[in-house]
Amino acid sequence: MKNTKKITLACQVCLAKNYSTNKSVTNRLEIKKFCKHCNMQTLHKEEK
């Protein structure tokens, strides 16, 4: 797994860091995922 880095996805509503994943692209990752703290699907953005 060369050229990949581990990132954390944080909820944009409550700022909880819920998910971690690997990525190999250079732009910032934004995904709609379920947040257990907000109890709904929200936008999660990449944290460093």
From Swiss-Prot:
NCBIfam families the record matches: PRK00504.1, rpmG_bact
Gene: rpmG1
Family of the protein in this entry: Belongs to the bacterial ribosomal protein bL33 family.
Name of protein: Large ribosomal subunit protein bL33A
InterPro entries membership: Ribosomal_bL33, Ribosomal_bL33_sf, Ribosomal_zn-bd
SUPFAM superfamilies the UniProt entry points to: Zn-binding ribosomal proteins (SSF57829)
Gene3D superfamilies per record: Ribosomal protein L33
A GO molecular function held by the record: structural constituent of ribosome
GO CC, alphabetical: cytoplasm; ribonucleoprotein complex; ribosome
